[in-house]
């Protein structure tokens, strides 16, 4: 069976790649778990960590104490030290099987190497060096009426599906914000047609 990354409804959960070096977690792991927790709570899904290495079960327990709902571990002697090909193959195999909706990598040397390779292999999008992450979630017209500077008749005409007090379905897309044009502009990027949406942070 081939991997279908366009069946958006088949994907769920927010995942964080947890980087370890010589049996020690990196400080960015905890920052990513914190950011992933916010996204997972907003989406109403689990936050999962993905840890690769050899004899890293103890690190998995440590990560669980920082807010991850689940930790997936790929434990093998060949994963003891980082290699681009080995880690890419292992991560892509797990993603193809378990289908996370969002996948976050740290903006470290390893994350910047690994994230784009996984995205290319899985034929999905990745936004590098994000400074802010958010989720495009259902909104309510009554909230718009209170918070918007638009006239009420403009709100009423925005979308026939937006009935007062009822949800308006939107995409649940990960909104990834990053500097563009030499830092003179902040661009928000989405990956609307493929999953998982990937980012380095």
Residue ranges of predicted features:
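N-terminal glycine-rich FAD/FM-binding segment characteristic of electron-transfer flavoproteins
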Residues: 1-201
């Amino acid at each position: 069976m081939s991997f279908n990354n366009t069946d958006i409804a088949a994907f769920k959960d927010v995942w964080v790649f947890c980087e370890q070096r010589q049996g020690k977690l990196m400080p960015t792991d905890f920052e990513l778990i914190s950011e992933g927790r916010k996204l997972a709570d907003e989406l109403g899904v689990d936050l999962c960590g993905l840890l690769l290495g050899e004899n890293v079960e103890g690190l998995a327990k440590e990560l669980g104490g920082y807010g991850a709902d689940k930790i997936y571990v790929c434990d093998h002697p060949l994963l003891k030290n980082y290699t681009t090909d080995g880690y890419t193959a292992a991560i892509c195999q797990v993603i193809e099987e378990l289908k996370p909706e969002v996948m976050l990598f740290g903006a470290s040397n390893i994350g910047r190497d690994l994230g784009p390779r996984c995205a290319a292999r899985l034929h999905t999008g990745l936004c590098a060096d994000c400074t802010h992450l958010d989720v495009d979630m259902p909104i309510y017209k009554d909230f718009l009426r209170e918070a918007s500077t638009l006239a009420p008749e403009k709100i009423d005409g925005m979308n026939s599906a937006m009935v007062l007090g009822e949800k308006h379905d939107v995409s649940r897309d990960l909104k990834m914000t990053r500097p563009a044009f030499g830092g003179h502009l902040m661009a928000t990027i989405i990956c609307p047609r493929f999953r998982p949406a990937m980012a380095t942070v």
